[in-house]
C-alpha cells in the first residue's frame, strides 16, 4: 500500500478471493510483476502479493463455493464492534462479525444497501 498513516474511514487494504489462487497469482505476476508469498499453513492458503519487496495486496481462496471471485476493499476503523453497529444502523448488513486476525487487529465483513461487499 502507498501509506500506513490511515484515518478512520479510509481504504487501508485490498485482497482478492479466488477459486484458483495459483492461476490468480500467475495472472497478477504477468500483469504487474507481483510475487505471491504464502502466509503459511495456518493462514489457510492466504498470502501476500509483493512488488519490489513491499506488500501491495493479498490473495486467498474463497471460503464459500457460491461466492464470486472479487477484490475486497478494507476500511480503517478504530473499533470494529462500533463499526458493525454503525453499518447496521445505516442500513447495511453484517456478512461476518468482528474477529481477531492474528496480531493484525480485528476484521468484519459487510454489505452496503446497494449490495457492495466491503470489510
Regions found by a protein language model. Name each.
Residues 1-3, 15, 59-63:
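Short, recurring structural edge motifs at helix starts
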Residues 3-54, 89, 99-105, 113:
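Core segments of cupin and vicinal oxygen chelate
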Residues 11-15, 28, 34, 59, ...:
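Short, structured motif recognition centered on aromatic/hydrophobic residues
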Residues 51-55, 59-67:
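Conserved donor-binding loop and adjoining core beta-sheet/short helix segment
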Residues 63-119:
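Hydrophobic, ordered structural segments
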Amino acid at each position: 500500500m502507498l501509506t500506513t498513516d490511515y484515518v478512520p474511514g479510509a481504504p487501508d487494504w485490498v485482497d482478492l478471493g479466488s477459486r484458483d489462487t495459483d492461476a490468480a497469482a500467475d495472472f497478477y505476476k504477468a500483469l504487474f510483476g507481483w510475487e505471491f508469498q504464502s502466509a503459511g499453513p495456518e493462514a489457510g492458503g492466504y498470502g501476500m502479493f509483493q512488488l519490489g519487496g513491499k506488500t501491495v495486496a493479498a490473495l486467498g481462496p474463497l471460503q464459500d463455493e457460491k461466492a464470486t471471485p472479487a477484490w475486497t476493499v478494507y476500511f480503517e476503523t478504530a473499533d470494529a464492534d462500533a463499526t458493525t453497529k454503525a453499518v447496521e444502523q445505516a442500513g447495511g448488513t453484517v456478512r461476518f462479525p468482528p474477529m481477531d486476525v492474528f496480531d493484525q487487529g480485528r476484521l468484519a465483513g459487510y454489505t452496503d444497501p446497494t449490495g457492495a461487499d466491503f470489510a
